[in-house]
Amino acid sequence: MSSSDSPQLHNIFVYGSFQEPDIIHVMLNRIPEIVSATLPGFKRFRLKGRLYPCIIPSENGEVHGKVLMGLTNDELENVDWVEGNEYERVFVEVVRKDNSEKMRVETYPWINKNDPDIGGEWDFEEWKRLHMKTFIEAFTEIMERKRNPQGKGRDDFSNVLKEEDPANAPSS
């Protein structure tokens, strides 16, 4: 097979829940090589009422995250499906933390930079402690239904991953 016949592979910078290998395994059915990296020129934010963050351009910002190395076109299609239409896949340059090399990768910034739901900083460790279990359970169910389309879809996944507003929670 010549190099022109080989499948195109993608390197994807992730900065939220997809930094967690267990979630990547659910989405891709494998854990690819993962390297730590920093994305300059962006800032990561919480999204009001949601269990996942967004990034938007910010001149002096930087986002710490991971690069998923060598994703196939089919795997990239899964990531696109999960990210939905509120994110846009774009090429960016990140700096690897292990060797300071720059890499051209793809990532998913939030499309609506003026979204009123954009809030304060999003913290990965806090998310793992408070929301990871719920996220993995919902994500596993949605990915299983995507592979065997007999029911819920991506919108159901988004609804499950919205945080409960304590003011609207039923009293016990």
UniProtKB/Swiss-Prot annotation:
It holds the Pfam family GGACT. The keyword Acyltransferase applies. Its EC number is 2.3.2.-. Gene3D superfamilies: 6.10.250.210, Gamma-glutamyl cyclotransferase-like. One of its GO terms (molecular function) is acyltransferase activity. Residues 146-172 are annotated as: Disordered. Substrate binds at residues 15-20. The active site is at 83 (proton acceptor). One of its GO terms (cellular component) is plastid. Expressed in flowerss, leaves, stems, seeds and roots. Residues 146-165 have a biased composition (Basic and acidic residues). InterPro entries: AIG2-like (IPR045038), AIG2-like_dom (IPR009288), GGCT-like (IPR013024), GGCT-like_sf (IPR036568). The keyword Protein biosynthesis does not apply. It is found in: Cell membrane. Putative gamma-glutamylcyclotransferase. Belongs to the gamma-glutamylcyclotransferase family. PANTHER family: AIG2-LIKE PROTEIN A-RELATED (PTHR31544:SF6), AIG2-LIKE PROTEIN D (PTHR31544). This is AIG2-like protein B. The gene is AIG2LB.
